[in-house]
Amino acid sequence: GTTIGAIKDIYSQLPEGVQIVHSCSTGYGEALIKAALLLDEGEVETVSHYYAASFFEPDVDCILDIGGQDMKCIKIKNQTVDSVQLNEACSSGCGSFIETFAKSLNYTVEDFAHEALFAKHPIDLGTRCTVFMNSKVKQAQKEGAEVSDISAGLAYSVIKNALFKVIKVSDASELGKKIVVQGGTFYNDAVLRSFETIAGCQAIRPDIAGIMGAFGAALIARERYGFKECKNTTMLSIDEINELTYTTSMAK
C-alpha cells in the first residue's frame, strides 16, 4: 500500500463526528511525508519504538526489532534511548530471509513457522551469511532433514545472527531484564520461542509487533497535542490529500 492509500482507509473508518486533531510521521520517509502532508510532528524511528514499547512495558530496558529487511537493538536507560545498534547490510537475520526459504519449499510463511514448533532435531546453521546458509540447508535436505527441523534451524539462526553478529553480545543475558520484541518477523512463533530459549528469558511480544513504530508515533501525537495552545491540526484535509499530484524527473 501507499501512505495516501492508508490515510484514505483511516478516514473511511472514522466514526461520524470524529476528526484527526494531531498527526506525526516516523520511520523511512518521515521528513518527506511530514512536508508533503503538512503533518504536525515528525519523530525519529527509535524514539517512536520506545514510546510504543514502554506502553506495553513501562520499565523496558531493551527493544529488539527484527523486520523484513533490517534489525535494530535499542537499549533504554533511565527511560531514555541510550544506544542503538542497526544492521541493514545483510538480510540473514531478517524476515525476508525466512520468507525466501519458505517459498522455495512451497510453504506459506505461516505454515513454515508452524512446522518449526514440532521440530525434533533443528539443523544448526550457526551465524552465517545467507549464501552459506542456502548451501547448508540444501545439504541438510539431501541428508533427509525434515521441513520442521529446517524451519526451526532458520528461526534459531535469525536470533543468533541478531544477538551474536549485530548486537555482538557474548552472553544473551546481557540484553536486559525487561525485553520487548517487535517487528513483523516476531509474528513467527518459532522466532519468538528461539529468542526466549537462547536469551533465557520471557519477552513481551505485542500483538501489533509489526506496526509498533506507527503506534509509537500515534502516542507521540496524542502527548504533544496536550501541550499545544492552538488545537487545530496543520495536516491536509482528506479533500486536499485527494487532490495531491506529483511529477517525476531525471537529471544527470
Language-model regions: role of each:
Residues 1-20:
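N-terminal phosphate-binding loop and adjacent alpha-helix
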Residues 28-29, 157, 170-198, 209-213:
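Glycine-rich phosphate-binding loops at beta-strand->alpha-helix junctions
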